[in-house]
Design a protein with these regions (language model features):
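Short basic helix-loop element that most often maps to the first helix and adjoining turn
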Residues: 4-23
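Conserved hydrophobic/aromatic packing and binding residues within compact polymer-binding modules
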Residues: 6, 20, 31-34, 61
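Recognition helix of helix-turn-helix/homeodomain-like DNA-binding domains
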Residues: 26-41
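DNA major-groove recognition helix of helix-turn-helix/homeodomain DNA-binding modules
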Residues: 45-60
Length: 65
């Protein structure tokens, strides 16, 4: 669910996975693995960085707001 939500918000912002990775300062492979469900429980730090890069709260990112 988290991966799908990240992808949804990323596409709304018209960001590529690579661009989001750079904005969040996390590896590109982490973004792809989280979005596809390979990483099911990313670290709180990674989720916080992704949420900040997408301009949403962690709660909204997790719940899909």
């Amino acid at each position: 669910m988290l991966g799908k939500n990240i992808k949804k918000f990323r596409l709304r912002k018209k960001l590529t996975q690579d661009k989001l990775a750079r904005l969040a300062d996390i590896p590109y492979t982490s973004i792809t693995k989280i979005e596809t469900g390979v990483i099911k429980k990313p670290s709180v730090q990674a989720v916080a960085k992704i949420a900040k890069a997408l301009g949403v709260s962690i709660d909204v990112l997790i719940e899909g707001g």
